[in-house]
Design a protein with these regions (language model features):
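Enriched for short, Lys/Arg-rich terminal
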Residues: 67, 71-95
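Basic, Lys/Arg-enriched alpha-helical interface segments
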Residues: 2-58, 73-76, 92-95
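A short catalytic or substrate-binding loop motif that flags glycine-/basic-rich loops and adjacent residues
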Residues: 60-63
């Protein structure tokens, strides 16, 4: 299954990585590892994670206050947001 990050989601990943890197480079690396693990888990069983909004699903990163919001289109897994839990819920719906 192909995985594609929406440009805004990719920007959210980079912003979070930079924030962690400024405070703790190991935390920044751990964030990226956790996100890679999330992608692999979702790729293996995309329907396993709960629905979140219309047509989307949510994977909560266990060690960080972020959720990976994704949609499935045939053989494509589209990550539409990597949302911090303090952001307004559903801000990504127009993507």
């Amino acid at each position: 299954m192909e995985v594609r990050f929406n440009p805004e989601a990719a920007e959210e990943v980079e912003t979070a990585r930079q924030w962690y890197a400024e405070r703790s480079p190991p935390a920044a690396e751990a964030f990226l590892v956790e996100l890679d693990l999330a992608v692999e888990r979702v790729r293996e069983a995309p329907h396993r994670w709960p629905r979140y909004g219309k047509g989307a699903r949510q994977y909560i990163l266990p060690r960080f206050p972020f959720s990976m919001i994704y949609r499935m289109k045939a053989e494509l897994l589209e990550v539409v947001a990597v949302a911090h839990h303090r952001r307004k819920p559903g801000y990504w719906k127009s993507r």
